[in-house]
Amino acid sequence: MAWSLELRRRNCGKDANLQSEEIDEQHESVDLLIVFTKSMQLENMLNSLKPIISKDTYVLCLLNGLGHEDVLERFVTRDHIIMGVTMWASMMTAPGHITFANDNGNVEIQCLDPKGKDETQKIVKILTDAGLNASYSENVMYSIWRKACVNGVVN
């Protein structure tokens, strides 16, 4: 089953409509997979995406919480795992409709293995060009832990 997603950014007049395709055994592998699912759903989601994950696929993990790299290593090698943290808040206004809740968020990412740094820096550029204020971090785990501590208190 294919889905569509509408992204809306407040106060800047930018909307994006993204269309998905159903994933089946015939699909080619993807270069980059960005995961945002809930922690408890990560492994099942990755299992369902196996047909499009290859040895060349990078996975960018922007989930809240800790320990996701342990699950990711079951699907891709460490030099293809990019951990990250985002301060872009969003809300689902209806199924398939997402609105950014702030106008000045950012994304910090880092590959778990230095061998993947060059590719990760290319992804930083793509995210920045898309207006997501991305940067390469030399210690993204610090930021991930900091956000986990804040979320643990606030939520």
Which residues does each predicted region cover?
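Flavin (primarily FAD) cofactor-binding/catalytic cores of flavoenzymes
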Residues: 1, 47-49, 119
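Short, charged/polar "capping" segments at the starts of alpha-helices
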Residues: 1-2, 69-70, 117
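Glycine-rich phosphate-binding loop and adjoining beta1-alpha1-beta2 segment
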Residues: 1-13
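Short linear interaction motif-like sites in intrinsically disordered regions of transcription factors
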Residues: 2-4, 89, 146
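Rossmann-like NAD(P)(H) cofactor-binding subdomain of soluble oxidoreductases
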Residues: 10-97
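Internal alpha-helical scaffold of NAD(P)-dependent oxidoreductase catalytic cores
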Residues: 51-52, 74-80, 95-154
